[in-house]
Each structure stands twice: as C-alpha cells, then as structure tokens.
C-alpha cells in the first residue's frame, strides 16, 4: 500500500530516513522489504505481501520496511482484532522506518477508506518472461475469517515493544481464526501504544475499539 505522487503524503513530501536511503523506490516511494514485486524490484504490487519474504522477515526478526535486523525497540502496526487474538501477522519495524511508513502508506495515513474491492486485478502479468508473476494467484479466503475486500478500513495503532518481548509464534488457529505465523501479543506490556488512524466504518452501531479502551486505561493508571 502506498500513496500516489499527487497525494498530500506523496514521495516529494515524505522525508526518507537515512536507514532507507539505499532502499528500492518506485515513483519516489520506498518499496517495503516484504512487498510483492515483479522481477524488477521497482515494479511492486502495492498492498500485497510476498508470503515467503514475510515469513523469513518474521522469523529472522528483520524490519518489514528496510529488511535489516531489528534493534532494541520495535514498532508493530496492529488493529483491535489483532490484539484480541494476541497475534500481529505483519513483521515489526524500526521506529524511523515505521514513521516513514505511517506517512507514506495511505491506509495507515487515513487516506484510504476501503480495502480493494477486487485484489485479483493487481496480479497482472508483466512482459518479462523470467518474472514469476505468471505463477501468482489470489490467496483463497479462509471461511473462518471475514473477507476484507471492499470493506471499510479499520482503526490502526502502533505498539512499541522491546526486542526481548518480540516473539514469533506459529498459531494453529481456531474455529474463528485461520492458522498464521506472527508476533505474539499475549501478555505483552507495550512501551507505548497510540492510535494512528480512525476506522472508516459508519459511526452508527459502531462498537467501542478495545485498543481505545486500553489506551484510556494506560493513561488513567499511568502504565
């Protein structure tokens, strides 16, 4: 996911941190390490993860943006549904890389209000005969989880945790959740927790966000 050059957070307006100075770019935007790309890495499929690279990034404790080893403090982008499950399925990031992503990604920046209605259209094949894009296929939805296609964007939060609490687990799933590898959030005491965008869902009959309530409790009791 990323914004277009003409958007308020386009590449000409989002400063690139020194850690990302040598990163691959497309239209001026840094291509995250875990983003699916054609054989030409400057041709990303924005918003789609490379499954193998994401898996390696999780278990290797690498940054999802720059691909380098994570340091003492890690930022993980999460939703309330992730917190309730106790699992964040995307790898963490360095604070400076996360800061860049938060401004450059339209979903995190609050500019994209709905998920793509038809993700399959982004799997178009390129003209390079050696590119593996001809093998790409949309992921089959798991019946235990609701589809996000075309649905309003959820509220997103950034959670800071020490690298000592950054544990990767292979969750077998349940009757309500598909199996997944991710960051274990169970029992983790966040160093910081803040909301970075509101949900785009209509306000009528909207349930309170569990992470909003957690933030309020942290402020009330000072932890």
Report the location of each language-model feature:
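N-terminal alpha-helical interaction blocks
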Residues: 1-56, 134, 139-223
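Short metal-binding segments enriched for Cys and/or His
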Residues: 91-113
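Short cysteine/histidine-rich zinc-coordinating motifs and their immediately flanking basic loops
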Residues: 74-82, 106-111, 143
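Cys/His-rich metal-chelating microdomains
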Residues: 66-69, 100
């Amino acid at each position: 996911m990323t914004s277009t050059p003409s958007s308020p957070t386009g590449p000409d307006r989002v400063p690139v941190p020194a850690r990302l100075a040598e990163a691959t770019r497309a239209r001026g935007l840094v291509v995250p390490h875990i983003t699916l790309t054609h054989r030409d890495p400057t041709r990303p499929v924005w918003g789609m993860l490379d499954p193998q690279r994401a898996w390696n990034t999780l278990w290797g404790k690498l940054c999802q943006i720059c691909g380098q080893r994570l340091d003492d403090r890690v930022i993980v982008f999460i939703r309330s549904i992730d917190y309730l499950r106790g699992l964040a399925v995307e790898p963490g990031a360095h604070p400076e890389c996360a800061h860049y992503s938060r401004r450059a990604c339209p979903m995190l920046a609050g500019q994209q209000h709905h998920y793509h209605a038809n993700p399959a259209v982004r799997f178009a094949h390129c003209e390079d005969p050696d590119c593996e894009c001809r093998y790409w296929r949309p992921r089959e939805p798991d019946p235990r989880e609701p589809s996000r296609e075309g649905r309003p964007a959820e509220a997103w939060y950034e959670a800071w945790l020490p690298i000592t609490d950054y544990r990767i687990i292979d969750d077998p799933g349940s009757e309500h959740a598909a199996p997944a590898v991710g960051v274990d959030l169970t029992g983790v005491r966040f160093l910081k927790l803040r909301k970075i965008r509101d949900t785009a869902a209509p306000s009528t009959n909207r349930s309170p966000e569990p992470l909003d309530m957690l933030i309020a409790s942290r402020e009330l009791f000072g932890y």
